[in-house]
Amino acid sequence: VICPLGVGEHFEYWGFDPAKIVELDWHEQQTLGDGFTVRCLPSRHFSGRGRSSNQTLWGSFLLQTPARKIYMGGDGGYGCHFAEIGEEFPDIDLAVLENGQYDEAWKYIHTMPDQLAKAAKELGARRIMTVHHSKYALAKHRWDEPLATEAALAADTAQHLLRPEIGEVVPLETPQPERAQADDPTGL
């Protein structure tokens, strides 16, 4: 298990072997062998609730393999870190970005729709896949609104948007068939 600083305690509580938990600070990396590394990178959020607020680090991750760079943005708001990561790690093959459960009151911890395309452009990833949507209702927007913003993202950037169905395997080296757009986000 690779996680940001202080989060390992939660994995221990859930029964994970402490010897198999690696905590990383921003810009630290863990070598996994055979040319694979995981690097913890900045994100913009907070951690914990109540009395345990902000006692652990939040982060994003870059998985580098011999053939690919995959950026996992995690749960977080827009910030200058996207441009910095894009500059430091050019040629990202896939960026997994948050798109959903947003609200103007949470704009510093959840990426807003108008910021999604900007973050994608700054990262410079060839392909984008969004997460953090269509599963539960935390925000006031419709459950399918984030899927509509994806259509705008695809039209507004040079990156290819992956829109897999739940459970679908999408090989990175092959194009994905077009899916329904904003007028029919369910694909039905």
Positions of predicted regions on the chain:
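Helix-loop-beta element that forms the nucleotide-linked donor phosphate-binding surface
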Residues: 11-23
